[in-house]
Design a protein with these regions (language model features):
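DNA-contacting interfaces and partner/effector-binding or oligomerization modules
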Residues: 1-54
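Short, charged, surface-exposed hinge/linker loops at domain edges
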Residues: 1-3, 40-132
Length: 132
């Protein structure tokens, strides 16, 4: 099964969403959810109008994987992950996290990996939680 990578990025006015590995699939919105919905609508239109000449990735089964830039992730999940909680999980200073969320500073690849590993670890842990 192919993976269609949709990149979510925060611009100054809205959120962009586009397929990283399939040229021509785009969307945007005022929120991450709107951008996701819009890029899915764009994908359906792309398939409809290119059905006789689809890129290889769209010819068979595929799944969508969303990849966020740091500002998009931090803003979108700010009601779930406080800066304090993220600092405890990652060791990244809250002030730095605020700079990354606002786009004032760009995190290094090492910092992005640190956040990614912490979130993926939490995801794995939570997927094993069940209530009696």
């Amino acid at each position: 099964m192919e993976i269609l990578k949709i990149i979510i990025e925060k611009s100054s006015d809205y959120y962009d969403a586009y397929a990283d590995n399939c040229e021509g699939v785009y969307g945007a919105g005022n929120t991450v959810e709107e951008a996701k919905q819009n890029v899915l609508e764009g994908l359906q239109l792309f398939i409809k109008y290119h059905k006789n000449n689809l890129p290889q990735i769209l010819q068979g089964d595929y799944m969508i994987e969303y990849q966020y830039d740091m500002p998009s992730f931090l803003k979108h999940y700010s009601t779930i992950f406080t800066k304090s909680a993220l600092q405890r999980m990652t060791g990244i200073n809250q002030t730095q996290l605020s700079h990354y969320a606002s786009g004032f500073r760009k995190p290094s690849n090492k910092t992005v990996k640190k956040l990614d590993m912490a979130i993926q670890g939490l995801s794995r842990e939570l997927s094993q939680v069940h209530f009696a």
